[in-house]
Amino acid sequence: MQRQHDGLRAALVAEGVEIVDVGGSLGDVKAVFTRDQAIAVDGGAVICRMGPVGADPGYGRRGEEAYITKVIANLGMPILRTINGTGLIEGGSFCFLTPKVAALGMSFRQNEEGARQLEDVLRASGTRLIRVPLTGHALHIDGAILMVDHRTALVNMARLPYWFLDELKALGIQLVYVWPSEGHAVNCLAVRPGRVIISEGCPRTRERLTAAGVESIEIDYSEIRKNGGGIHCSTLPLVRDRDGGRGTV
């Protein structure tokens, strides 16, 4: 796992990305999935409230919020809201579709109170939030859709309701469908518009991305995928250049 995580880090640096380490003595190996801990929006960050609570000390993800809060505060990035009370949200289930339209995948890791608190923050910048019920035991929306360019999305249609696919088309978003046996391909990372880092083992999906004008960089992430997440899960973009170039994760 460490070797593959180091490989992701090297790929990000090669793309001009500035990396900030969370650090801390996190006890759960799933803490590598920093995407879930916070959400970057216009003007600052929203600190999430994690779903899993460990029965024993050092197990479960509740508590990771404290580490990411310290990191973001030390960077001088405004914290606009901390999801509190009974609210639940994990960042892997949030995505921007356009600058003013976002989606939140609803599952047992997200609830209506969490969605309401996030919506309060987004409303201040004129951003609409679409609640998308996820299928079965799916946890996060990043296993179903990823924006790979300004108006192009990689999607796993088996994990999204039909009406939401129609909504994407109404927003003018071109849909690139993952190859049915390569569902993990969705959990990739756009490092700039039209360029993604993707897991090995997705040749047919990569062909479809290429046909849509999207470049892909392939890395081995198989061991970390066994831990229940992917490349997208392992990164938390904080700032992206307006020109689509370098960013900070």
Give the ranges of each region predicted by the language model:
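The feature marks the mature, well-folded catalytic cores of soluble enzymes
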Residues: 1-249
